[in-house]
Amino acid sequence: MIKLSVKEDCCGCGACLQRCPRHCIFFKEDKEGFLYPLVDESNCIDCGLCEKVCPVINRGECNEPLYVYAVKNRNERIRLNSSSGGVFYSLGKYVIQKGGVVFGAAYDDKWEVRHQKAESMDTLEPLMRSKYVQSRIGNTFVEVETFLKQGKLVLFTGTSCQILGLKNFLRHEYENLLTVDVICHGVPSPGVWRKFLMELTHLQSHKTALCEVAGKKTVLLSSPESISAITDINFREKEKYGWKKFGFVVLKKSVSKTGENSVLLSNIFSEDPY
């Protein structure tokens, strides 16, 4: 039965939940909004599969990189619409053109971050750009295994703990599986992200606030609308801020008195917000 001596060591990858043959594991948010596994002990058969797939308990081997490359997409539009150099788009396009499936993080209709699949170029675009929030993996490991057994080429992108969780879950090396680790130093919880968006979209009507955070200016432009008013979220806006500064932008349907439809424009994200 899955149990870590330090609860906070859990990365929330969901490998244990998806591998459990009795479906007796479920995830629940704690007071900080992070997802942690709980076990229905009355249904557990102590098979130990949940512990075998856990990337915290079974960290695997440390592999040394064979080669290191610096890469960027040649298409400027794709680079501007990406968080960095647009490499994910090229990898995803290659896999889809081969009849494969791409898995990555996307926003759902409530702007929460979830892993989902893309089998066409239209469905690939929502997976572009980094989302600096813990994603809900859902049942994607099971889906990946199904596609791999069908012989399809699969690309799975995620944080290092999610990738290791997937590989432990599969328990088999597949030549038709490509994985891309996103370098991660920790992310805010889904609960904190949800609360942030709710507070952001319920500020005083058309109020413009300018505050100083560690010497950096943050502009808030908002009206009292629900999260459904949001039309786009970009953690790395480049057309307005360029490549040197980090610009976090939330777009909404209505327009403020200043003529901007941006809820939040900020350049403080190159600093430690805490």
Where are each of the predicted segments found?
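Iron-sulfur-associated redox domains of electron-transfer enzymes in respiratory
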Residues: 61-274
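Iron-sulfur cluster-binding cysteine motifs and their immediate structural context
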Residues: 2-6, 15-32, 36-38, 48-65
